[in-house]
Every structure is written in structure tokens, then in C-alpha cells.
Amino acid sequence: MSPLNDLKINLNGQYTFFLNQNVISKYSGSLRKMIKQSKKKRNKKKRIITIEINDFPGGPDGFELVSRFCYHNGEILIDVSNVSTLYCCSVFLGMSEKFCFSNLFLQTEKFLEEVFYGSWSDIVSCLKNCEQVFFQADSYGLVDKLIFAALNKISQNSDDFSSSSLSSFASSLSPEMAKNTSESDGRYISRSVACGRSNEWWFEDMTNLSPKIILKLVMIIGAYKTNIKSLVLTRFLLHYLKTKLQTKSRTTTELMRNKLEYSDLADTAVRGVISAGTRTFSCRKLFWILRVLSSFSLSRESRIGLETLIGEMLEQATLDDLLISARGSRESGFYNVDLVIRLLKVFVKNREEEEEESRERNMKEIGKLIDKYLREISPDQNLKVPKFLGVAESLPDSARDCFDGVYRAIDIYLQSHPNLTPQDRTEICRCLNYKKLTMETCKQLARNPKIPPEIAIEALKSRCGNQEHTTSDVKVANKSFSCRYSEEKKKPVVLHLEITEKLAERLKTKGGYNLKVMDSFREGL
């Protein structure tokens, strides 16, 4: 160790620097004071003075920059990639003109003044450098000043990005900053507009910034968790969160570290979407927004607000829209069935106030969609019977002219879940309206070995009893079945069914009607 290195600095409890007291204290008032105090307390036999410094801006990299400045006689190359760090270090260590002419604080302050009046790219680069020293940069007001400068550039070149808050903070800037638009900015923005980006020319650059800085921007313009009126800001937040989600595999640690900030940004984006409403966002776009924002721990209030917006226009949805993967454990199912049930409840409740003709048309549309959805989710091994019924029974009976689609979904479910109990097989058929089954489907149901016998009989009884008859005996088009219907209601109804031998063995006398097996056509089923 060189005899000149008589100062030991332990930085943030992890790093150690050996420096010369005279060199370092020449520029730093804080270090000069700490050295003086340490000399009073130290053992006279110890030549090296030890100083502990915690929470230093930029950590060891920041302190190395300061040391380089001191050892190069107060000179260092300052650029947009390090000026924010150097500025915070100079404030932290008290490197003002009081101790040295043209000290680090003055040099960084002059450079930043040029940045405030300079190009868009320089402002963004300085904001990026603030991420390394965010706590200090925010405390010293540097983040606010850079965001003001950035927003000033955006407001000058984005017609739709205007609000009273922009006017208020713009007035706090100097006249030079408020009216300045550099030639380089003009060329950059012109290229963006030519590419069709218009008011979104700044999106990609700002997306590279940390959520802490974006959240600070949102707070400055008064849009934090409020019903923001700026559609451009809403679109930016959606773009920002989508981009961060796409890089999640590479930045999982960063996302977890900033979980609270991302959640706040997502909630703010939802407020903007709700303010814009369905006139701005299509049903498909709203589903996309829900997929993206649900990954950032939305608050319950935001989730309900977004789901309500989607539910009110659910008749415009497609099957792909509804097939949203469940989050977390797959034990509850591959698809987010609970979400669809909630959306259906909103839809049905919202349609109660519609005119009858419009309500009936929309109900029929959503009925067809949900039947497709049921068939799609039925093979899921983790889909429980109550969840299946929750979807099927979310719509009123009037939403379906025919229940064939529901039966097909039940058939798929039974084939995919061979270990269901007899009680579950009976329970899942609860959602069927037998009178709205076609005769062909009714016959398929009766042949289906997965369907409990009592369900098959009840379906056939309801279907035959629902026919209009002109004679006492009715022959169904397919000769597999024949029905004799007695109009004397006081007497038992005799229902003759041609069914499989296996089913015949399981049939018993039920209620007020007798079941009689016909042997003539067993082989045909």
C-alpha cells in the first residue's frame, strides 16, 4: 500500500477504497468534516483513518467516478450517461464552490442546464442514468426537472397530449426551456410522424425507463389512479406494460422488485381505459388489455371496473377472446372459467334494462358463443362439474332456442372424465332443457352409456310429451323409438322405448309411468 493512501473508506458495508486524505478532502466538504471527526476519535498509533459511508449514490461505481475526478485535479468527462450519478454524488459529498473553484457540483449543474434545453434523446438518457441513483435523484429534485423537460418536449409535439397539469408545470420552467425545441428534435419527430407514429413518437424511448420514473411522470401530471382524460397517456401506459411483460422472462427479478410500481401503473391505465369507454376500445381490445394488465396485480376495484366494461359488450366477443388461461396452479383448470362466469353475470344484468327485441337478439348471440366455449373447455381434466354448470347456467333459458350444443359439451365432458361418480353424471345434466333438444340429439342421449338411465328416460319423456299429436299413436321418423301418449291425464302414461339390453337391465319402475322394454329393435342401437 502506498504511504499516501492514509484514508480507508468502507462503502455501503461491502466495498473498501484506500485514498489520500488531502486529495479527496480538497473537493468534498462532507469528507473533510468526517476526516476531522475521525481524527479526534482515532488511536494516535493508527496512521490510517477509517470512515464508514452508507447509501452512497451509485454505489462503488459512483464513488469511483468521484475519486477519478479528485485525482485528475477536478476534471472528468461528463456526458448524459453519467451526469445524473455525478450530480447526486456531488450533492451527497458537498462538492461545492465553497471548497474548490469549478467543483463537481457546478460542472454537473451546468451540463444539466444544457440538457434541459437540449435534445429529446439527451433528456431520456439522463433519466435513464437516474435509475442508478433514483432515491437521491428524486430527493434532490433532478428527476422532476428532467421529467418536466421531457413533458415539455412531448406537449410541444403531440397535439392530443395536453392537460391543465401540463400547463401548470410548463409555467414553472424558464422561458428558454418552455419555448425551446432543438433542430435535432424536429428532425427526430418528423421521422416519427412519417412512420405513422404521430403522437406516439415518444413511446419506445420512454418504455426503456424504469417503472419508478414512469410512475413519477404519471404523478407529476396529476394522472395517478385518477380518471385520466389523456387517451395518449393511457395508450402509452398500455404499451409500456405490454413491452415489460414481453421481456418478463429476462427481467423477472426486476418485475418482482418493482411489483408495487407496476401495479400502480396498471391501475392507472385501467382508469384511463374506463374513462375512454367502449367508444374507444373494442371488445377484443378490452380482452387484450385484461390479459396484459392482469399480470401486474390489479387492484380489486380496477379488475371489477375493467370486467364490467367488457361484460357490457360481451355479445361482441369471440371464442378466442374467452379462452384466457388461468393464472397460478393448473389444479383449478387450464382456462379462467371464473372470469367468464363473472362476465356473464355482468352481461345478463346489463341486458335487463334493454328493449325486449334487442335483449333477445343479444342473448341468442351470447348463447351460441357460450355453447362453443363449453365444448372447448370440456376436455380440461381439472374442470370440475360445478364450474361447468356455473358457465352453462349463467344464461337464462331464453338465451337458447336449442340445447343440442349444451348436450354436445356434456358428452365431451363425460368422455374426457371417465371416473365421474353417478351423482356427478346426473348433476351435470341439470343444465339441459330436454324440451329444447332435437329428436336426433334426444336419441343420441338415450344411446349414450355415460348418461344415467333416469336422465335418458326423463329426456325422452319430455321430448315425446312436447310433440303435438293428432293420433293416439305416434311413430318417430327413426323407427328406433315409438311413443304411445295417453291424453287421459288421470291414468299412468305408458311409454314404450326400444333401447339397449344393457340399459334395459338397469331400468326400474319410476313415478307415475311404467317402463316396458321392447325386444324387437335392441340390435339396432
Swiss-Prot record:
Q: Which GO terms describe its cellular component?
A: Cul3-RING ubiquitin ligase complex
The BTB domain, residue ranges: 5-79
Identify the residues that the record assigns to the NPH3 domain, covering every copy.
200-466
Query: Which pathway does the UniProt entry assign to this protein?
Result: Protein modification; protein ubiquitination
Q: Which UniProt keywords apply?
A: Ubl conjugation pathway
Q: Its Gene Ontology biological processes?
A: protein ubiquitination; response to abscisic acid
Q: Which InterPro entries is this protein grouped with? A: NPH3/RPT2-like, NPH3_dom, SKP1/BTB/POZ_sf
Which family does this protein fall into?
Belongs to the NPH3 family.
Q: What does this protein do?
A: May act as a substrate-specific adapter of an E3 ubiquitin-protein ligase complex (CUL3-RBX1-BTB) which mediates the ubiquitination and subsequent proteasomal degradation of target proteins.
Domain comment in the entry: The BTB/POZ domain mediates the interaction with some component of ubiquitin ligase complexes.
Write down what this protein is called: BTB/POZ domain-containing protein At1g50280
Q: Which organism is it from?
A: Arabidopsis thaliana (Mouse-ear cress)
* Organism lineage string: Eukaryota, Viridiplantae, Streptophyta, Embryophyta, Tracheophyta
